[in-house]
Amino acid sequence: MDQKMHDKGLEIRKAVLGEAYVNNALKNVDSFNQPFQDLLNEYCWGSVWGREELPRKTRSMLNIAMISILNRPHELRVHLKGALTNGVSRDEIREILMQVAIYAGMPAAVDSFRIAREVFTEIDKG
């Protein structure tokens, strides 16, 4: 494992998803899933999210579209919050989901719009 890249990834992960969310995920690490968490931090968040060629806002926008298409509701919730943290507006999220509708199908968009509204409501309630 590249410890420097792992640490960089962990820092980015906390900045995007929130320190509380990441710390909660890490407190559930055991010998079975530790290698996966290391991979997640080093490769996903360090090696890819840590690249300079795309800003975090753009990466978040891409993630919303891809995760919507893959029908991963838990991850969509997490990344919608991260996208807002990275400066993606609610209007931009709506437009991403409109694009999902025409290229990936209405069922994917219906679920994603519902999840986005739930996330917005949760945030608005504090």
Regions found by a protein language model. Name each.
Residues 8, 12, 44, 61, ...:
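A general alpha-helix detector
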Residues 36-38, 72-79, 100-115:
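Short amphipathic alpha-helical segments at helix boundaries and their inter-helical linkers
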Residues 40-44, 61-68, 96-101, 112:
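Short alpha-helical scaffolding segments that buttress acidic/His motifs in well-ordered protein cores
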Residues 91-95, 108-111:
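Residues forming well-ordered secondary-structure scaffolds
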